[in-house]
Amino acid sequence: MPLVFRSTFILALSFCVDAWAYESDQYMNRKQDVADSLLVLNQQVNQAIDKVLRGKRPPTTRKGIARGIWREIGGVYWADKIERWAAKSHLVDKYEQKRHNSIYRNMPIWATRVNFVFGVGRSFKLNGVMVGSDKFGHFFSQGYKYYRRELRGDSDSKLLARGAFAERWLFGHLTTGVYSNADLVANYEGWLFYQSLFLDDIVSDKPAILVWREGKYVKQRPFTWADHVNAYWDEALNPSFNVPSLNKRLRKSIVALCPEAREAPAHYLVMNDQFLWTRYQHIGLKDNRENQFEAICGL
């Protein structure tokens, strides 16, 4: 194995003791009838917020509240607590998918890199969107890093650039061959979540989740994933930018799925693609929309 791949695997393994997988696969199984987990996952997040607020010594600063929620539902390991819970819980319906039977199957190790070893994670339906389990970690842990840097005084452009750098080197392009635009969207929406705890209109036309009242923070409205999850969380609808060796093989695999896509195009199209691209382009997305089903299959 060449030195570059040995180094890649050493780096990956050092971070993957508690990992479920590096990437997810939203290309296959799109037509499966899977229950939407919006309500049950809303409940998990709201319970975590309530637990932080109702503790014996609840935090009284924005930094403390954000850290408390992250500790409750995020975590220092590769897979966040909510990600591990969702993967195990019978309350969360999953798409039928095996870790090594994915869009990446039969691809060589030099194309798929770490995915060749770890396979892919589970996918769920959330707010009508097919979402990989890894997006929970991006939302809570990477979003928390963005927010923490904001509190330290980093400019928006600087913290967004650091997020793109991490996707390029640690979390994505170097180790998996994939620069995930959907990961960056989840990071960004996670940052907005932490902001929306304290600021009005971060979520359009909604007050902050919390309000300062009588010397403490109290919740004035519930959290819902519907404020943050959209089609650009879906790796197939918001395609990643891949290394050439992977992209060439991935496009062939997508072509093989075109008959299914033509039978039920609604499962394979982004109805508001240009709106979402415009909304998120500034966060560091790399345009690879030529890999959308619409472009490859002529939908």
Which ranges hold each PLM region?
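N-terminal signal peptide c-region/cleavage motif recognized by signal peptidases
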Residues: 14-18
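Sec-dependent signal peptide recognition
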Residues: 2-10
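Intrinsically disordered, low-complexity, mixed-charge
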Residues: 20-161, 171, 175-184, 188-299
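Acidic-residue sensor for enzyme active/binding pockets
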Residues: 167
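Residues in flexible loops and secondary-structure boundaries
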Residues: 9-12, 144
